[in-house]
Amino acid sequence: MKRKCLALMVCFLMVAFLSGSALAKDKVVVYTSLETDEIDKYREAYLKDLPDLEIHIIRLSTGELGARMLAERANPQADLIWGWAVTNLEDFVTKGMVEPYKPKGVEKLDKKFVHSGFSYVGIDMYIAAFCVNTKVMKEKGLPMPKGWNDLLDPKFKGLIAMPNPAASGTGFLQISSILQMYGAKEGKEDGWEFLKKLDKNMGQYIKSGSRPAKMTASGEFAVGASFDFVVAEQKKQGFPVEFVFPIEGAGYEVEANALLKGAKNLAAAKKFLDWAISEGAMKEYSKFKYGVTLPGIPTRPDLPKFSEIKLYPMDFAWQAKNRDEILKKWETLFLK
């Protein structure tokens, strides 16, 4: 009898062990600078498509993410980057902190958004835009701005919000596009002189790319320098706001994914990166972003058409190479 009970107990423990093994999930740690609103929507998709992964998403602003990765360089705590500005990734490729990986299906993507050595793979793009509160504009008798130059009007003093470029990728693309417009690549200082004039009207620099639009929508500012889909979301929610894409040329950024060197959960990281460029994932991105890197997927209908926007031809390599110098100078001039 004792032997029978012992045998049954052993069988029970084996079943329990095997069941537990079957239910065990592979862990993966993901760093991202995608907006919280986006991640909340994407979560349902990746949980459905990757049921065997235990996915830990850590969301940080663009600047904070970079600082954290540098601090953890000797002992990486994340396995991959999901949706980070190419300008920043270029720098980390140079620093040797990214492991080349060719995710499944990458051949279907537009090649110009894929790193030649597969150090990163672009997934989408966003465009800098002004969020203009029409109610505040009317109350204060302000003219509708068409571009950056219009914001130098003294009437806008204290009524403009803009992202801090040291913390926000959106902020950096805005100031880097202005600097390039004014000849910074040729060594000219005109862009910095323009930013000094703009600073005189600045109400607040904010450590977020989306909050200038959200604060403007709530009536705290007349104009918030932000980016496309955040303005669209505020308008969708019923706030009295309108898009303005700078007539001088709107800056834009590409967001990309990368495998981190020293990833502790390599197989799980690769599985997530495969999913992150799948058609299903791209369709989710397209609900927020201006364009995705998988051809044939339409963008959201409430965003203005590409033909209606003048894009400034951004030089991502120049931006990456000069990023630290630009931010150091910006902080010296404007964070007093």
Predicted regions and their residues:
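A bilobed periplasmic-binding-protein/Venus flytrap-type ligand-binding module shared by bacterial periplasmic
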Residues: 131-136, 176-181, 253-265, 284-285
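Short beta-strand->loop
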Residues: 98-105, 119-121, 149-152, 239-251, ...
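A ligand-binding cleft/hinge motif common to bilobed small-molecule-binding domains
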Residues: 87-91, 217, 222-240
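Short, well-ordered beta-strand elements
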Residues: 25-35, 53-58, 159-160
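Extracellular/periplasmic bilobal clamshell ligand-binding domains
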Residues: 302-336
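Extracytoplasmic ligand-binding site segments that recognize negatively charged/polar headgroups
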Residues: 33-40, 63, 77-217
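Periplasmic-binding protein-like
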Residues: 155-163, 194-199, 205-206, 235-261, 276-299
